[in-house]
């Protein structure tokens, strides 16, 4: 084991020395040739700044510009709320203190912006109602073009309870933006919302019943994706809703689909009602039998069935333990208790000391009157009941009959919703500093993607440039999740442990102590080593003698001249021919039977 350790240490040390020695030799060879260049570089470094350190790429902000026709687009980079109208309404059925929509809005940069010059709409106050809206360039009509709504949200302080969704306000003669409130008719509501641990991404549209004219909200199914990160990571996220004329829809976050479906199949409640409904006037007949099982009417109670037998009986085999104190009560008055000074016997009655466990019973098996313990009665059967059998008159669970739905309609084009002419934010939030940016309403996917790349794309690039390296990210992650430190330690320690194990592992030699555990005689290790060394020395002397003899023979052969060498050369080919002939099968003698 010690030899393995020494070998590992020598290998590591030797490698280091060799590398250092090679580097030193190279430096000695080149030092005279490069001396002048080094002096010049030192002088240049004094006059020029050091640019060897890597610098993070700088992202320059430029306000996005729509590359095609849009119904609405605003990046807020002009620095004002121009075009937006603050609501002056009051919310119904709410205390006057919080009924007003008096929440503050401002246009400003993010608090920790990585893209100077990029401004957005900021919800500034908490625990207040906020409402702000803006007119579209022209109303959006649901015809042959898709509808694409997109905007950015950053929960700069996280989010405790509140929403960041937009409403597309329906085009109606009554629409008045300075009276925008929670009951203002809208066509679509879309965006993130959170309260407690319930994380939502709303897509709701109001569908008009063509028969009654009543509007009903239709909610998209919940996304399968985990939405929590979008609310907690304090990064800017891009929310996109795409509605197509074929009734399909897609919901994207950061340009990745998190939900999709069809307006006809994936909304709750469904757009179209059932063709048939249960008759509300139908009633179950009195003789309708819903019992799948009934008691057997032909069953008879057995004669030996005793319904009066108790479930428990005293154990007749039990005996009173020795030392049982029959005359001692289990509880006695506390001798140390005293009547309270404020005790009024007229009001509280006669005072009695509280009961405590009898100290004499602690050393005894029990006190008081001894009673036999109760055991299960083997003859107990309980009240007799006839066995259950299948009901021959079973008719199943009754349901009212189906009748045609008088309110049935079939709308195969729910995409053709109520036109809208404004976009608004009507929010309640317990968290301030919610940042909105780069709203766009359009019918061209290419234009929306260009707008996203020029706006949100720059934010993403700036965030990436400012992010720490891999080590920094690992440290940040471990600060949020301390158990990651264990993973890091194991990841580093495991390879080191394997290297040590490889270097130090070897076949374990038996020790003298182990030899003594067996009856077989064992040789003395030291004597064997001495004998091996003596044999090795003798072998070395013999090899030296043989080498000297061979050298002497060679010198004698050289003195004899070239005659012997020539004869030897002549004999070699002949000997080789004889050997080949002897190996040939034809020259072998037949074997006698």
Curated annotation (Swiss-Prot):
<dbReference type="InterPro" id="IPR018124">
    <property type="entry name" value="Calret/calnex_CS"/>
</dbReference>
<feature type="disulfide bond">
    <location>
        <begin position="161"/>
        <end position="195"/>
    </location>
</feature>
<feature type="lipid moiety-binding region" description="S-palmitoyl cysteine">
    <location>
        <position position="503"/>
    </location>
</feature>
<feature type="disulfide bond">
    <location>
        <begin position="361"/>
        <end position="367"/>
    </location>
</feature>
<feature type="compositionally biased region" description="Acidic residues">
    <location>
        <begin position="526"/>
        <end position="548"/>
    </location>
</feature>
<feature type="compositionally biased region" description="Basic and acidic residues">
    <location>
        <begin position="282"/>
        <end position="320"/>
    </location>
</feature>
<comment type="subunit">
    <text>Interacts with MAPK3/ERK1. Interacts with KCNH2. Associates with ribosomes. Interacts with SGIP1; involved in negative regulation of endocytosis. The palmitoylated form interacts with the ribosome-translocon complex component SSR1, promoting efficient folding of glycoproteins. Interacts with SERPINA2P/SERPINA2 and with the S and Z variants of SERPINA1. Interacts with PPIB. Interacts with ZNRF4. Interacts with SMIM22. Interacts with TMX2. Interacts with TMEM35A/NACHO and CHRNA7. Interacts with reticulophagy regulators RETREG2 and RETREG3.</text>
</comment>
<comment type="similarity">
    <text>Belongs to the calreticulin family.</text>
</comment>
<keyword id="KW-0472">Membrane</keyword>
<keyword id="KW-0106">Calcium</keyword>
<keyword id="KW-0812">Transmembrane</keyword>
<keyword id="KW-0564">Palmitate</keyword>
<dbReference type="GO" id="GO:0005783">
    <property type="term" value="C:endoplasmic reticulum"/>
</dbReference>
<keyword id="KW-0007">Acetylation</keyword>
<feature type="binding site">
    <location>
        <position position="193"/>
    </location>
    <ligand>
        <name>an alpha-D-glucoside</name>
    </ligand>
</feature>
<feature type="repeat" description="2-3">
    <location>
        <begin position="382"/>
        <end position="392"/>
    </location>
</feature>
<dbReference type="GO" id="GO:0006457">
    <property type="term" value="P:protein folding"/>
</dbReference>
<feature type="repeat" description="1-3">
    <location>
        <begin position="315"/>
        <end position="326"/>
    </location>
</feature>
<feature type="binding site">
    <location>
        <position position="167"/>
    </location>
    <ligand>
        <name>an alpha-D-glucoside</name>
    </ligand>
</feature>
<dbReference type="GO" id="GO:0033162">
    <property type="term" value="C:melanosome membrane"/>
</dbReference>
<feature type="signal peptide">
    <location>
        <begin position="1"/>
        <end position="20"/>
    </location>
</feature>
<feature type="transmembrane region" description="Helical">
    <location>
        <begin position="483"/>
        <end position="503"/>
    </location>
</feature>
<keyword id="KW-0430">Lectin</keyword>
<feature type="binding site">
    <location>
        <position position="75"/>
    </location>
    <ligand>
        <name>Ca(2+)</name>
    </ligand>
</feature>
<dbReference type="GO" id="GO:0072583">
    <property type="term" value="P:clathrin-dependent endocytosis"/>
</dbReference>
<dbReference type="InterPro" id="IPR009033">
    <property type="entry name" value="Calreticulin/calnexin_P_dom_sf"/>
</dbReference>
<feature type="modified residue" description="Phosphothreonine">
    <location>
        <position position="563"/>
    </location>
</feature>
<feature type="topological domain" description="Lumenal">
    <location>
        <begin position="21"/>
        <end position="482"/>
    </location>
</feature>
<feature type="region of interest" description="Interaction with PPIB">
    <location>
        <begin position="327"/>
        <end position="360"/>
    </location>
</feature>
<keyword id="KW-0597">Phosphoprotein</keyword>
<dbReference type="GO" id="GO:0030246">
    <property type="term" value="F:carbohydrate binding"/>
</dbReference>
<feature type="repeat" description="1-4">
    <location>
        <begin position="334"/>
        <end position="345"/>
    </location>
</feature>
<keyword id="KW-0496">Mitochondrion</keyword>
<feature type="region of interest" description="Disordered">
    <location>
        <begin position="261"/>
        <end position="346"/>
    </location>
</feature>
<comment type="function">
    <text>Calcium-binding protein that interacts with newly synthesized monoglucosylated glycoproteins in the endoplasmic reticulum. It may act in assisting protein assembly and/or in the retention within the ER of unassembled protein subunits. It seems to play a major role in the quality control apparatus of the ER by the retention of incorrectly folded proteins. Associated with partial T-cell antigen receptor complexes that escape the ER of immature thymocytes, it may function as a signaling complex regulating thymocyte maturation.</text>
</comment>
<dbReference type="InterPro" id="IPR001580">
    <property type="entry name" value="Calret/calnex"/>
</dbReference>
<feature type="repeat" description="1-2">
    <location>
        <begin position="296"/>
        <end position="307"/>
    </location>
</feature>
<dbReference type="GO" id="GO:0051082">
    <property type="term" value="F:unfolded protein binding"/>
</dbReference>
<feature type="modified residue" description="Phosphoserine">
    <location>
        <position position="555"/>
    </location>
</feature>
<protein>
    <recommendedName>
        <fullName>Calnexin</fullName>
    </recommendedName>
</protein>
<keyword id="KW-1133">Transmembrane helix</keyword>
<feature type="topological domain" description="Cytoplasmic">
    <location>
        <begin position="504"/>
        <end position="593"/>
    </location>
</feature>
